């Protein structure tokens, strides 16, 4: 019976992860293609759905623990899903941040060509997808490869920040737009960080090895 409930729980998590991934993809798509309707859909339709799923999963986990009092591996799995649930909801919030800044930017002239942000987003989306796959398949090799990708996203963020500081210094009229681009790049970076957190948890639950978090989660 518990095994059936755990499988049901994992299906709910996969649904939530799919929504989180879709929210990030749509927020970037709306920015690149300047499509207001896509961005508004992320904010007005997808976010409420994400919040519903987060609450549903949280209650499901709490009820499982109360009813079945799981031990050892099963308890660790439920606790990890609780944490992943929180991380995925935060990724949804970050996609909303991206969409809100994108809604501001698409109505104004571009500060710079959008080259690095789509690259950065592609890396982060792949990290998220692989993080969830590593959990489903208990694939620590895949989880470790995701952790290594985090540096790529960080480097792109630093490059974007340096460029935007140069733009703002030379032309103060770009400051407000540049700040929104910085907000987008930092949101993408946090998505990559949260995906890495998921992978660290996969490694712990599968191998029993604690991988120290490389960054604060502020």
Where are these regions (language model features)?
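Cytosolic, long alpha-helical scaffolding segments
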Residues: 1-218
């Amino acid at each position: 019976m518990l095994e059936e409930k755990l499988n049901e729980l994992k299906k709910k998590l996969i649904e939530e992860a799919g929504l989180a991934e879709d929210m990030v993809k749509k927020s970037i798509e709306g920015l690149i293609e300047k499509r207001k309707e896509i961005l508004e859909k992320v904010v007005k339709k997808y976010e409420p759905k994400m919040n519903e799923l987060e609450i549903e999963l949280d209650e499901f986990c709490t009820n499982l623990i109360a009813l079945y009092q799981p031990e050892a591996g099963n308890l660790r799995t439920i606790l990890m899903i609780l944490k992943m649930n929180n991380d995925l909801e935060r990724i949804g919030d970050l996609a909303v941040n991206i969409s809100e800044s994108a809604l501001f930017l698409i109505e104004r002239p571009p500060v710079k060509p959008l080259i690095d942000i789509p690259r950065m987003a592609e890396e982060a989306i792949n990290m998220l997808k692989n993080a969830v796959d590593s959990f489903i398949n208990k694939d620590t090799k895949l989880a470790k490869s995701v952790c290594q990708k985090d540096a790529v996203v960080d480097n792109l963020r630093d490059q974007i920040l340096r460029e935007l500081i140069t733009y703002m210094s030379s032309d103060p009229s770009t400051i407000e737009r540049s700040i929104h681009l910085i907000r987008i790049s930092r949101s993408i970076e946090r998505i990559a960080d949260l995906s890495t957190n998921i992978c660290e948890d996969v490694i712990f639950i599968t191998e029993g090895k604690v991988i120290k978090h490389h960054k604060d989660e502020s």
